[in-house]
């Protein structure tokens, strides 16, 4: 890698108290090197080569997702999550960062530097890529809502406000009967009072006439939140926007997440059965990589050639998702990473199951999708009283 040996040599003897400066130097070297992350020279002029519309960022649709344990008759643990997601259209041909808004182009270069194989063959006919931007909030509370002191044997009050940026690559290996979706998502945000979790919960509880939680003064303290998620999913290769008629399929996957939001490795499988199952990579609760809305070269056929056998069609299916993960860090259980705080004895192994139904249809020439699921999660810490359950609703619209 160009220049990295020199950077590492220059960091010899750097004090331990300066890790952020060291990381900044390395990232800057990756982002601003005259050799880009894709192995070719980058134009640094004010007038980059002409960019076609297919190589520029255009928005394809969005998703609003709400998760809450009130759907399952409880009010504790992971108690609420909301996320608003925007998804781009497919970027055709080889990826050109200079054709993208600067922050997104820089992130594409950073991924190519940190994971050189991710953009390999990005211009091949058997691969495509798109971008997902997500803004969301999550909140966690103990079981006892009336106590105003720290509850040592229950999870801390915690909130997270975040912005996520994900690149998705859909790949069909040559002559293979399967296809893959690779995801690289960077999440940045804030933990603590600045997440506005207390205010959000109080607003909802007042509107519904529910007693408010009294212990938010003991929530985790403010600190920056970050996480890098790397995920791969795979399923049988299918042409078109749906699998026509009645059918079923299986989606497998594995992921690694690193950061002070969560550090964990997971693997899972999803089973789907129904009518006109969409040619995507499944339905999941809120987490990095979940709102993948993968690239789909046939999306435009909805309006240009609606009678094509490849075009999107109404349909519905049921799904069952099973996932297991090994957890090394979870801010909602381990507390603040950069200062002492309330925490509990986290379990290193967690399993999760989700059962739901998803339907898609065409309204006024626009694609609409609604997915509803119930999620069960095993105990996450020693003192937890049994498993936890919550409901999830997601409404998606294609522009």
Tell me what each language-model feature is.
Residues 105, 143-145, 270, 275-399:
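Outer membrane beta-barrel transmembrane domains
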Residues 148-152, 212-218, 255, 339-344, ...:
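Extracellular loop and loop/strand-boundary signature of outer-membrane beta-barrel proteins
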Residues 82-88, 135, 163-169, 228-234, ...:
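Residues on the lipid-exposed face of transmembrane beta-strands in outer-membrane beta-barrel proteins
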Residues 67-71, 140-144, 172, 191-195, ...:
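Sequence/structural signature of outer-membrane beta-barrel proteins
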Residues 41-59, 90-129, 171-183, 236-250, ...:
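Short loop/turn motifs that connect adjacent beta-strands in outer-membrane beta-barrel proteins
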Residues 106-200:
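Long, hydrophobic/aromatic-enriched structural stretches that serve as scaffold segments
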Residues 62-68, 133-139, 186-192, 232, ...:
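Transmembrane beta-barrel strands of outer-membrane/channel proteins
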Residues 76-82, 157-161, 182, 222-228, ...:
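Residues that define the transmembrane beta-barrel architecture of outer-membrane proteins
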